[in-house]
């Protein structure tokens, strides 16, 4: 494994939390959701075989918590077959360097995310002027310089398959980031959405703290392409998922999920797109 891997110089612990922090939820027999402060990671696998895959890598300084969560489900010294990234924002790759060094495993992402994960390019800066709550206002403090995980990173197969996750396929869901992906399993309609949509109003400090469940579009302060975001939500809603784990907020399932997604598609411009902000295209809103 490549030893020359690092975070951007602005990477730091962010003192944000929620009542869900540290909680594990078994969503399906082989799908687990663990909340790290204000973001979710997913662990996919059969605890009886100790084989699993980690989806996303949490907040900065959370490696020990993620390793402990994995070992709680899959046994002491267990390690995933791979890490799959829905995208590369700081709260989804916050522990990736330590996890790579600890587990020595490959990491997969969409090819359009690779420049942000190999030190070549920074994401557009978060927008603290966007319409929204306190978290949006402080988003300028969030780490944004590119990380470099070098040769440990591989692009996802072009055929839509997901390494070490048989039955799942990856779906390109851009808008929040250029190479954002979601993961879907047809046999039980299980969806790992990433930040394509979330189940908490992520720009509101109060709602993040309390984890009040309500469907929303992607986090406003980081989303740069609202037209693509809307199309991505429509694409996921058309799959008619029966259970969804999102990057932020509690898992959602059944009638609540289907009705909420229908509402989000129908009223996306009102629910998701902010009235103002530097990435808002007035022509589509």
Q: At which residue positions do the language-model features occur?
A:
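Metallo-beta-lactamase
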Residues: 5-14, 59-61, 113-174, 178-256
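Residue-level marker for buried hydrophobic side chains located in beta-strands
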Residues: 53-55, 84, 107, 190-192, ...
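Short, acidic/turn-prone active-site loops that include or flank metal/cofactor-
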Residues: 59, 111-114, 196-198, 268-270
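Short hydrophobic/aromatic-enriched beta-strand-loop microsegments
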Residues: 104-111, 128-131, 192-194
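Binuclear metal-ion centers of metallo-dependent hydrolases, dominated by the metallo-beta-lactamase
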Residues: 249-285
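Active-site metal-binding motif and surrounding structural segment of the metallo-beta-lactamase
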Residues: 63-109, 113
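Conserved beta-strand hairpin/beta-sheet module of binuclear metal-dependent hydrolase folds
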Residues: 17-74, 182-194, 199
């Amino acid at each position: 494994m490549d030893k020359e891997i690092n975070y951007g110089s602005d990477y730091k612990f962010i003192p944000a939390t929620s009542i869900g922090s540290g909680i594990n939820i078994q969503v399906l027999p082989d799908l687990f959701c663990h909340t790290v402060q204000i973001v979710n990671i997913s662990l996919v696998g059969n605890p009886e075989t100790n084989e699993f895959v980690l989806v996303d890598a949490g907040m900065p300084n959370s490696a020990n918590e993620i390793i402990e969560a994995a070992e709680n489900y899959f046994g002491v010294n267990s390690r995933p077959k791979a890490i799959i990234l829905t995208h590369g924002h700081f709260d989804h790759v916050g522990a990736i360097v330590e996890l790579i060094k600890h587990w020595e495993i490959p990491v997969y992402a969409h090819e359009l995310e690779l420049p942000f994960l190999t030190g070549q390019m920074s994401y557009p800066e978060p927008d603290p002027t966007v319409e929204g709550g306190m978290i949006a206002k402080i988003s300028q403090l969030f780490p944004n310089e590119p990380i470099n995980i070098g040769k440990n990173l591989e692009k996802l197969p072009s055929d839509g398959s997901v390494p070490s996750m048989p039955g799942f396929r990856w779906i390109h869901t851009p808008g929040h980031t250029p190479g954002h992906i979601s993961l879907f399993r047809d046999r039980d309609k299980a969806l790992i959405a990433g930040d394509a949509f979330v189940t908490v109003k992520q720009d509101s400090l109060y709602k993040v703290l309390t984890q009040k469940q309500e469907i929303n579009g992607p986090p406003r302060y980081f989303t740069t392409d609202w037209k693509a975001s809307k199309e991505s939500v429509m694409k996921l809603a058309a799959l008619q998922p029966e259970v969804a784990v999102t990057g932020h907020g509690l898992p959602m399932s059944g009638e609540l999920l289907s009705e909420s997604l229908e509402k989000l598609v129908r009223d996306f411009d009102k629910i998701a797109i902010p009235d103002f902000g530097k990435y808002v295209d007035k022509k589509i809103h």
